[in-house]
């Protein structure tokens, strides 16, 4: 497994900081995963423990993994845009990863995120995306989530005691979503302290089961 820094360029001309962790040479490449971090106005960046655990784990399961800082975070250019411009940031990450995967083998590109990053990722619906992985998404009943009616697969990981969107509230929001799996992390709240490695394993297992199934 190798790790490199990278620069993403958004369609509106911003340069974003990123890291890429590639699949070890002795592991078959399955595809790639984008990881979007929690809310930048509350200290979120690409080094958050949940994001970092996924960044370390997923390459061992066959997925090149990219984490990045949203616009206005650390050395990424621009300023926070309340989720709108940040969708362009995720799209730039998908564009970057498309050069790492083999389209002829139908390698997959998944959009993943935690908290704010999950909510942003769920509204990036471009054709190159294979599906979505949303960890503790802070969804509300009036949220307009672009992927909700999309037939591509979705994994929603929700902490049992999430302060913003607990399992029962999530069910009321996503009850009519297509092709959606839900996984509850017992004894965890929104911040998932002590549960980051468990979350990473759940994501890796879900992706592996999709391939084997």
Regions found by a protein language model. Give the residues of each.
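Catalytic histidine neighborhood in serine/cysteine hydrolases
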Residues: 176-191
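Serine-hydrolase catalytic machinery in alpha/beta-hydrolase-like enzymes
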Residues: 15-104
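Short beta-strand/loop motif that positions the catalytic acidic residue
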Residues: 150-151, 156-158, 162
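Acidic catalytic loop of the alpha/beta-hydrolase fold
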Residues: 160-165, 190-191
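A domain-start/cap signature at the N-terminus of enzymes
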Residues: 1-9
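Short alpha-helix in the alpha/beta-hydrolase fold that links the catalytic acid
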Residues: 165-175
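Catalytic histidine-centered segment of alpha/beta-hydrolase-like enzymes
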Residues: 188-200
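Primarily recognizes the serine-hydrolase "nucleophile elbow" in alpha/beta-hydrolase
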Residues: 88-152
């Amino acid at each position: 497994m190798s790790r490199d820094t990278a620069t993403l360029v958004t369609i509106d001309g911003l340069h974003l900081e990123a890291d890429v962790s590639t699949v070890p040479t002795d592991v078959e490449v399955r595809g790639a995963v984008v990881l979007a971090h929690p809310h930048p106005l509350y200290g979120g960046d690409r080094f958050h423990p949940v994001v970092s655990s996924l960044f370390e784990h997923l390459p061992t399961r066959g997925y090149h993994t990219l984490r990045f800082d949203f616009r206005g975070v650390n050395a990424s250019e621009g300023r926070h845009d309340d989720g709108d411009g940040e969708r362009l940031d995720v799209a730039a990450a998908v564009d970057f990863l498309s050069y790492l995967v083999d389209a002829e083998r139908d390698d997959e590109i998944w959009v993943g995120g935690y908290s704010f990053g999950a909510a942003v990722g769920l509204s990036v619906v471009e054709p190159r995306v294979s599906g979505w992985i949303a960890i503790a998404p802070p969804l509300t009943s009036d949220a307009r989530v672009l992927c909700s009616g999309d037939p591509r697969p979705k994994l929603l990981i929700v902490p049992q005691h999430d302060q913003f969107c607990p399992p029962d509230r999530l069910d009321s929001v996503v009850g009519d979503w297509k092709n959606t799996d839900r996984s509850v992390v017992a004894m965890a709240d929104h911040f998932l302290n002590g549960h980051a490695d468990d979350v990473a394993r759940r994501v890796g297992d879900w992706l592996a089961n999709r391939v084997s199934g």
